[in-house]
Amino acid sequence: MPPTESPTTAIERLLRSGDAAGALRIADELIKQSRRSFPGWLSRGCANMNLGRLVDADVDIDTALKLSPTDPQASLLRGMIDQRLGRIDNAIKHLRRVSASSAPQSIEASNALAEVLWFAHRRDELAAFVAAGGAWLRDPRAALMIARVRASHDIDGAITDLQSIAARERSPILRRVAGFEAVGLLDKTARYREAFDLSVKLHADTTPPFDLEGMLAPVRQQHAQLASASAWPAPRVEAITGLAMVVGLPRSGTTLLEQMLDAHPSISGIGEYDGVDMLANDLVSTGRWPRAASSIARDDLLAMQSRYMSGARRLTREGATISFDKTLRAWRWLPAIAAVLPGTVCFQVARDPRDSAISTFLSYFHPINDGWTASLTSLRRVLEAERSILPSMLQSVGLAHECIVYEDLVEDPTGHATRCLNRLGLAMDARVLAPEANTRAVFTLSHEQVRRPINRTSIGRWKNYEFAFDSSWDALACAHDERRVIR
């Protein structure tokens, strides 16, 4: 930090440059100097949100608003965090207030409000908000919202608009989002080759190089240990209760299962909570995981457990006794979960690998965090790695679990729901069979699908793109078919 630069100026500079971790360090120093530092808590919340630590950001912004209840920047962040945590009504309340104000943040709040209305399927409200006009419509991002509204009555026109955004805008993220929305509409109108070709171009233009080998390294270590039949160390912390977790890859039916189980009054979906990422980072940062796991201090393991559970409970609906974490990272970190969170009940979900792959390839994923989604070849390698350790790893590390094949779940939702609830010690509740009636908002790529009754339409989707799959997929597909009970 230059000598003449104030802490808040330094934080703003670091956030603009993408160094959220550096901004967090300065914010922590401000709070260390005074627990009543509004700039410290506000900056900490912004940095944590940028780092994906939404529970920490949630606490930070709550604290900031207690210190300055009417601050527009804090209200903006409050609304954005609430959206990602599924608190839609609260998000809309905060964002509408800032959007309607004369504060400099009104443009950002208007774009965020439009995004909330879109994901919450409040399409009439979104159309009215766009029709009302305002300065925010001159922001480049507003073109995306206008195209989304147009898609409700003119799909071909919306495709043209979205493709234009993807081709001309300077922001790579905006190009990517608009482009993949165009892909979705092309797929919806059976223009499959166009959808595939546009996806190839978008991935090539907006996905930086990705370290696939680094991502798969811990999976290979686990596979080697499974092959050697070596036992994993017994947990050195007490088992927790009231936690269930998805184990699986994106686009495998995980959101459907979450919405089904969340409809049970005793279960609360907590979305893709970042707790497993933080737990894994904490373990790796000891320098002893996994080869010297037994030398990690028990107190450190307890602190990791407490941090995870505290965040999960904060996200859990009042009255529910079980938190359901739909993390998409757990499959790579099962030994870590068993070491820190013994007692977790896991639900492994697997879908036809070709359906999972094409659905992922045609969808927007974060280009840096999820760069492995940029080609069918890398998708196949990740699927092969996942299935090389699952479900065997769940048994090996001693985690209670159920294995669910997506196609069977769709064919027999009653039987599968009953099995899942029995594993959690709960009685069947008919509400779990109507996930489309669940009012909980979903901030995932499956937000539209789970608004419909359970159906078979996504089974065999890969056949529309059969030209993209060669014989290298045959072994994965055959192994999956052998797991199916209902055919």
List PLM regions with ranges.
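Phosphate-binding active sites in nucleotide-utilizing proteins
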Residues: R236-L341, V345, V349-A350
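PAPS-dependent sulfotransferases, especially Golgi type II membrane carbohydrate sulfotransferases
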Residues: A127-V130, R150, D156-I165, E169-S171, ...
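Residue-level detector of the short coil/turn that links helix A to helix B
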Residues: G18, G52, G86, H121, ...
